Amino acid sequence: MGRYRVRVVTGAWLFSGSLNLVRLWLVGEHREAKLELQLRPARGKEEEFDFDVPEDLGPLQFVKLHKQHTVVDDAWFCNLITVQGPGTSAEAVFPCYRWVQGEGILSLPEGTARLAGDNALDVFQKYREKELKERQQTYCWATWKEGLPQTIAADCKDDLPPNMRFHEEKRLDFEWTLKAGVLEMGLKRVYTLLRSWNHLEDFDQIFWGQKSALAEKVHQCWQEDELFGYQFLNGANPMLLRRSTSLPSRLVLPSGMEELQAQLEKELKNGSLFEADFILLDGIPANVIRGEPQYLAAPLVMLRMDPGGKLLPMAIQIQPPNPSSPAPTLFLPSDPPLAWLLAKIWVRNSDFQLQELQFHLLNTHLVAEVIAVATMRCLPGLHPIFKLLVPHIRYTMEINTRSRTQLISDGGIFDQVVSTGGGGHVQLLTRAVAQLTYHSLCPPDDLANRGLLRIPSALYARDALQLWEVTARYVKGMVHLFYQSDDIVRGDPELQAWCREITEVGLCHAQDRGFPVSFQSRAQLCHFLTMCVFTCTAQHAAINQGQLDWYGWVPNAPCTMRMPPPTSKDDVTMETVMGSLPDVQKACLQMTITWHLGRLQPDMVPLGHHTEKYFSDPRTKAVLSQFQADLDNLEKEITARNEQLDLPYEYLKPSRIENSITI
């Protein structure tokens, strides 16, 4: 006879408990025992029970659960179950972290991470095969739009597997804050009904309510060239700027601009010439909103970096040259102030489109969804890489599904207020896929390719590289615990299937863009996993959080333009500027949505600080603890640096980086 102490831990969010009766069995190597237990699990509770079992069960392998119901299937969210056997102080941990519902019996394997083939007992191999077969029926791929990465097969959030859904607090916060934002938007529209809308200062009438301190700074300084240039390095979209290696072929310098050409060539020779080219937007059809045509441009911006690290614009060409049209107008800082301002506004509008669609939606959200679906389909719960990745896919499938049904859907937010809406956004995304390379998702490669290494004022670049290094050390520490050689990597069939699923299925044969179809070494695996974790955490934080700060003051980054780009500098008036910018309704909706999507989430889990105990090995706990310590040290370093800056760069402070893409 032996005594077993069983601890049952229930989730802490709303409706995690259950009124249904739960029964448990302990399954050991020799036999199993049904526990005389009638449990009705309560939300947020840890409940302990002692049981005397008459026969030796042997080493524990599984805990089996059965939730009985008569009339109502009251789902239960079980975090984990631990069992302390006779004669030992050690606990066997059985992670669950899922909803228990329906009539069937759920088996939870003992949580030690195991590779395929590591199992001395065939029972674990059969379990992981059965689990993957069931998961592949639950998590299916779908094509949202031809030519784009595959998505989870779900027409709406209610079609998602229950374990990928928002928990109740998250759902309520998401839906109620959106309603509060819409209410605020309505109040702003009423407030402006009988007031003029003829000058830039009139935007002050709606610049109240939900905004940040940095948004107020943008409001005050947005017309300054220095802040315009700063945004290419450290704003909402630090992903487009590159150091020039030659003068762009599309740059047309009219006669009489020899002095500008000499300046450009001098900066080029000194290595201080930079460019931001929005050519991806060329030819994308613009939206028509309520019968009113909107407009798009494909600007080219030439900038120089002064000795103090300030990035300053030298010239803006709003449209690329067209053989059937006159040479495009080149706008300069010396032009009439309103003409130069309008040229910069056109650039900011173009940056809004690429930031939201290419670098935010495609390069973080859709890539993370591919990683999430492939992980659920190919890696069983016992696999160490599943345990490593699963905290970083929390809520991603639901937020992406909501995006496809509310934001970028037919009649959604993009169609209502954004100049690439109405179908242009899909064309733009399809074009952007060609630029979605493996290297583009890895900051050491991407920043080197764009010539942005070792620039003191490039704060995104500096912080991204440090976070990449910290994440890479964490990943390497975990991988080397389970893969002692390259041969073990090559011989892991589940891992290799996961790699192929991402590259060939989810990313639609992306091997021609540098993504691997197999892993041949530990180093290659570590690099790929670092990319996965970084994309789902730090990169999304850098791209998402800036919306609240940089897009809240609408003239700094208008979602749409209502007049075509100017072709003459002398004809630009305040009427032209205001007629180009979004009207009150569109401006209010832009402020509402960017606040809703860019704010810090009240239930956020900071990077590396997830509480789920998927790993039970003490060695993995030591690796995670070191990761957390490294992040804390980086936090202190960034905080100390920011105290010396007029414009602190906060987006990659580890405490502000969410552990997964949840918004």
Curated annotation (Swiss-Prot):
Q: Which cofactor does it need?
A: Fe cation
Tissue specificity is: Found primarily in platelets and in microsomal and cytosolic fractions of the epidermis (at protein level).
PLAT domain sequence ranges: 2-114
- Example of a GO cellular component annotation carried by this entry: cytosol
Q: Which residues carry this modification: Phosphoserine?
A: S246
Cofactor binding note from Swiss-Prot or TrEMBL = Binds 1 Fe cation per subunit.
**Pfam families given for it?**
Lipoxygenase (PF00305), PLAT (PF01477)
Does the keyword Oxidoreductase feature in the UniProt annotation?
yes
EC number from the UniProt entry: 1.13.11.-, 1.13.11.31, 1.13.11.33, 3.3.2.-
At the top level, the lineage of the source is: Eukaryota
- May I ask which residue range the UniProt record assigns to the signal sequence? none
Q: In which pathway does it act?
A: Lipid metabolism; hydroperoxy eicosatetraenoic acid biosynthesis
Q: Which Gene3D superfamilies match?
A: 3.10.450.60, Lipoxygenase-1, Domain 5, PLAT/LH2 domain
Q: Which GO molecular function terms does the record list?
A: arachidonate 12(S)-lipoxygenase activity; arachidonate 15-lipoxygenase activity; hepoxilin-epoxide hydrolase activity; iron ion binding; linoleate 13S-lipoxygenase activity
Q: Which reaction does it catalyse?
A: (5Z,8Z,11Z,14Z)-eicosatetraenoate + O2 = (12S)-hydroperoxy-(5Z,8Z,10E,14Z)-eicosatetraenoate; (9Z,12Z)-octadecadienoate + O2 = (13S)-hydroperoxy-(9Z,11E)-octadecadienoate; 2 leukotriene A4 + O2 + 2 H2O = 2 lipoxin A4; 2 leukotriene A4 + O2 + 2 H2O = 2 lipoxin B4
SUPFAM superfamilies, per this entry? Lipase/lipooxygenase domain (PLAT/LH2 domain), Lipoxigenase
Where is this protein localized, as stated in its record? Cytoplasm, Cytosol; Membrane
* Activity regulation field: Activated by EGF. Arachidonic acid conversion is inhibited by (13S,14S)-epoxy-(4Z,7Z,9E,11E,16Z,19Z)-docosahexaenoate (13S,14S-epoxy-DHA). Arachidonate 12-lipoxygenase activity is decreased when PH decreases from 7.4 to 6.
Q: Biological process (GO) annotations?
A: arachidonate metabolic process; cellular response to lipid; establishment of skin barrier; fatty acid oxidation; hepoxilin biosynthetic process; leukotriene A4 metabolic process; linoleic acid metabolic process; lipid metabolic process
Q: Which PROSITE patterns match?
A: LIPOXYGENASE_1, LIPOXYGENASE_2, LIPOXYGENASE_3, PLAT
Q: Which residues form the Lipoxygenase domain?
A: 115-663
Query: InterPro entries in the record, alphabetically?
Result: LipOase, LipOase_C, LipOase_C_sf, LipOase_CS, LipOase_Fe_BS, LipOase_mml, PLAT/LH2_dom, PLAT/LH2_dom_sf
* Family matches, as PANTHER family: LIPOXYGENASE (PTHR11771)
Q: What does this protein do?
A: Catalyzes the regio and stereo-specific incorporation of molecular oxygen into free and esterified polyunsaturated fatty acids generating lipid hydroperoxides that can be further reduced to the corresponding hydroxy species. Mainly converts arachidonate ((5Z,8Z,11Z,14Z)-eicosatetraenoate) to the specific bioactive lipid (12S)-hydroperoxyeicosatetraenoate/(12S)-HPETE. Through the production of bioactive lipids like (12S)-HPETE it regulates different biological processes including platelet activation.
Tell me the protein family, please.
Belongs to the lipoxygenase family.
Q: What is this protein called?
A: Polyunsaturated fatty acid lipoxygenase ALOX12
Q: What is the lineage of its organism?
A: Eukaryota, Metazoa, Chordata, Craniata, Vertebrata
**Gene (UniProt):** Alox12
